[in-house]
From Swiss-Prot:
Residues 649-661 have a biased composition (Basic and acidic residues). This is Protein FAM135B. Residues 445-483, 514-548, 648-669, 718-740, 790-819 are annotated as: Disordered. The modification Phosphoserine is found at residues 775-776. Belongs to the FAM135 family. The gene is Fam135b. The keyword Disulfide bond does not apply. The lineage of its organism: Eukaryota, Metazoa, Chordata, Craniata, Vertebrata. Keywords: Phosphoprotein. Residues 731-740, 802-814 have a biased composition (Polar residues). The keyword Repeat does not apply. It comes from Mus musculus (Mouse).
Amino acid sequence: MSEVQGTVEFSVELHKFYNVDLFQRGYYQIRVTLKVSSRIPHRLSASIVGQSESSSLHSACVHESAVHSRVFQILYRNEEVSINDAMLFRVHLLLDGERVEDALSEVEFQLKVDLHFTDSEQQLRDVTGTPMISSRTLGLHFHPRRGLHHQVPVMFDYFHLSVISVAIHAALVALQQPLISFTRPGRGSWLGKGGPDTGPEQPTISLENLVFGAGYCKPTSSEGSFYVPSENCIQHAHKWHRDLCLLLLHAYQGLRLYFLVIMRDIPELPTMELEALAVEETLSQLCSELQMLNNPEKIAEQISKDLAWLASHLMALWTQFLDTVTLHSQVTTYLTQEHHTLRVRRFSEAFFYMEHQKLAVLTFQENLIQTHSQLSLDIRNSEYLTSMPPLPAECLDIDGDWNTLPVIFEDRYVDCPVSGHNLSVYPNFDVPVTSPAIMNLKGKEKNLINQNSSSRKDIPLSTTEAPQLGSDEDVTRRPEVQENVSTWNPIDVCSESQVYLTIGEFQNRAGIPEDECWTGPRPDAVKDSLTDTDICSRSPGPDEGQTPALTYIDVQSSNKYCPRAELVQGINVQHEHRSSRESYGIVKTVPSKVVAGTSQNNSTSLNQTAALELRTLGRGVNQDGKPVLLSLKLTPAEPCDPPSTALREALDTKPSQPDHAEEPEDLSALSGVIKRSASIISDSGIESEPSSVAWSEARSRALELPSDRDVLHQVVRRHAHHRNSLEGGHTESNTSLPSGIQASLSSISSLPFEEEERELALNKLTKSVSAPQISSPEESAEGADTIKNTAGFSEDLDPSSKENSPPRHTSLSYGGSRVQDVRAGHSLADIALDSDRPQGPGYMDIPNDKGNHPELQEPCCLDGMAETPLHVETKGLNLKIPCTIVLENSKSRSFHRAAGETAKGKPEELSMSKCVLSNNSISEVRAASHHRVPEISCSPAVEAVNLNSTGVQNSSLSVNDTMTLNRRHNASLEAKHEAGTVCPTVTHTIASQVSRNQELKTGTSISGSHLNSTEAFTLDSLKAVEVVNLSVSCTATCLPFSSVPKETPARAGLSSKQNPAPITHQPLGSFGVVSTYSSKLEEEVSERMFSFYQAKEKFKKELKIEGFLYSDLSVLASDIPYFPPEEEEENLEDGIHLVVCVHGLDGNSADLRLVKTFIELGLPGGKLDFLMSEKNQTDTFADFDTMTDRLLDEIIQHIQLYNLSISRISFIGHSLGNIIIRSVLTRPRFRYYLNKLHTFLSLSGPHLGTLYNNSTLVSTGLWLMQKLKKSGSLLQLTFRDNADLRKCFLYQLSQKTGLQYFKNVVLVASPQDRYVPFHSARIEMCKTALKDRHTGPVYAEMINNLLGPLVEAKDCTLIRHNVFHALPNTANTLIGRAAHIAVLDSELFLEKFFLVAGLNYFK
């Protein structure tokens, strides 16, 4: 067996130490040790970076391969200490020479981080004498090609609450013959007691034997140079050489690409030139040189030289990288955000939520509880949970795994629930059997040599076979992510489902070979491709010829809750043509699904319009030469329409005679799924854009709280500049995908108080994975000038222009942001100039206008164009048809300039996936993938119809902005046709004839090509989102391919806190977003992530439960990492949020310490003040009245003592403490604060007492304790404080006001908790009470007394959580105590609960 020595280096940085809640003052020290699996022979060395010769007693040092940080002293609460120690661990590994890469990937690396403490200076002198008080072990998931680049805030245990920020960078730096001797792990004696170091040292292998394999015999000196090795030996040498060189080249490329990424994303880093080693070219050169050699010694020597040469380049780059990033604060911030986003996403798995009608809270939902129990068991044993990948650098104690993370079910009781769906958002969605590794998604590295914006590949997921790519193809994809997640406020506005009709269920992404693209003249592909059709036009004007044939597609859905709701009227496909128009084939791409939802609105602005007629769709020509106009009608429906069930109705064509109709054209074939998407009407009366197809209605709502709007206002203020930096100041809108709360900014974008920011903020917002996206000229002067000229250009647009003049295209401008609209009836070259398409490739969108509004920011004098309404609520009618996408020169959008240059015969570069990197600015050319689609069209050139729907309807919409470009567009397009820059394959879409639509149900899709002019626009901090969109069904937040966004870094002058979340560039097999920067290295998606995604989809299909997963939402509760670098100064003028924490029976003030900690960490700068109640900790066995008086006194004294200006008050209670809280609310002295109540978080509270406890053991124990302690509270909990049940304390308490004053009432319960009956903690009926004719009626009255006022309260939302902890088999678990206290001391439960959902209740 040949063996290879591989060298891996780990750079570990200790940044800051945070005293979260340490008990002891004194001297602390961090010690770091790298551990390698003992199964692999290895040698480890450690060193400290930048340490001088002289070192003091307290400075960092190395002791026995462990690095000791400098000693630091902790004296104060919340103290932060900068450690700033950097260390380097070098590991030499002996690897199997036949499978070096696999062997490297399998090595288990662990980083042990220990916290040592002493309060004695004397003890510090003894290195080994300082005791360790806490320890954490990080699993490092290193990949030889990508390395590892991650940052982890390591939190120590409950008794030593503190955090050390650790950054880790790792890379493969060398592969060579074994030059050092390795100690083999000993086999041990027959008793197995042998230690790891008992094995003999392995003798070194000669280079020739290593290179030529075991069958090689070194020739004797007599044979000399006449000896020729066998063919097998030569082949072995060449393969060995090729494999090692390839791995080193990939490692070099992976490190270089990551280096380029962070230089681009972090403006503060110095920009430098990095030497490029093209993988294929360099490898072929090295191999060809080797093949010219025959002498075995020279072959071996050359191989050794090549490996050393590559290793030297790799080491030089690695050194350069470390010099740049080590201890750099901005790099730390970047990695911190990345880790936090991934971690929150991972926690959101196995966290379900479901909505119910408010009245359902009073019903007995036994089936629901049983479903939860069964589902939790199914999940624990499902491949979905067991295949969940780890984080790139993980600590099981604080990150958990499938075996330790809790499963949580949330039930929300709201006025207008979203239900009627099972977890399978797209039930017909097929997860492909082809894994990404099989799909050859490799590309050439050269695309990043000249381009900063890295390529990204989209994995094709379709109902048919996934198209494959050529081995050398790049698929650079426009980012398509839905960040427009509408918040849904059940109080202010009923959940308004939005109609979006999506023709095209998936995004089928693949590429075409580059040789199929051409830049020379191809008149045959171009000559018939231009039609003089309106790109975005309403019904034709009187001066136009009209063919009244109309195809009417009626999409209907059923609604079991609100039958009055009117649904989508249909898609009118009108055929019209002008008198002199030739008949050309129009591309009507009609894939297999129509995803639609009905839309209701109870606001006055919607009712202003009796019907919505969206005819701003593209007109083209069908097979019979009749131009086709797609239009949508929507009549407003009744408010409060709960979602309809998923319907699969074919979009059958029916005759209809609106406007200009004669004969109906047949356009049947669409199997539809009608889905709902909730949205909210903002304060300004403008509705947020619905989630795109990639989002379920559940995903389209981030926060379902009455205070959502307040929360969002707060968030928007906090992230005002953040959004401005989403694009780093360039004019591309969809190149970034925000994470966390930022992902909901689309829905926030219409809030009135941010009008002044809209011009800068809105144009940065990305729309959705496949939905309308917004692009704007932003601050660029050229773009502004272009907009100013809009009126003039629109005048040139004559509806009866010449036959061969290119069609117009239009864009809607929202306060400076532009949505380029439909393009129909023209070839790819026609669209090439208008290539700044925010729209993701493969879809055609229908604008979602709600009616006309007199106010337009820019004049709407477009011929044949209808005015785009302003200040009108938009329902998301997105008709998505796969289409071509191209890039516009977005810096200036100067079509005349491009036209002039092209007319001079300057062909544009047809960029399939190439990016350009300049020293100080980054230009990005996004090339859409090209799909191989069946050429079933009869016309010579099939054009792509691209209907881009409008984005968020903001205060000012101007159709006119992009129309200004039309006249210039015409000239430039003609010039482009002369230049012949057309990719013919792209011009084929899946259908050219309406009559053939039935064949399209398989869902083939067209792709677009991005044509990039030679003068690529350069913009600072331009970049692409690398989110691998598996399909429409794969939400932007799907774990594997999450839209855990990749956003731009803060621009110069903006604080690093506003730095958006980066996408991860992590090794295969670890959890997270798949980075495209490494997409040129190998198959982009790891097998593990891919199988996890498949398992998740399978799980959602198999389990038919009406509910949703939080992981399918784009916005979760936490988007800001712990300890942000720049916390905003608290402005206490608005008052503070007082949070009162009340412990339970026999508890103390420290019981809710972790709860307080995670809220504080999750909401930095949240103006929170915690009162940890301690007045009752000495006697929790007293009666409730006594304890109520104590707590009330404590609260009022706290407010008066600190002279607090209270804006809101929230309560968190555990167990019996919840009863005390409810009792306080009834006291007259507290009446003044009732209007300030915000959230009541009840953790296992016995609100209905301890009646009907199913644990005899616990009931007996409580009875015994009550007797021994003579406890009044326990007596009252068991309803034995009065013979008349209706005079018992708990019954009388239920009759008093209380819960309805809160905005959020959150009840957390667990069936594993036997201390408090499950139904009592949830305040609901139980089966035993129903059968009990004596106590049961009283029990039911209590429930009605408690929940009745809550149901009637408009501003109150009830949320119940059902938690299934992963508990060990212990006595505590058996008696139910473990689950009872897990809500207090389980870091995994608390972090999962708060980071995913719970923090919303305290914002």
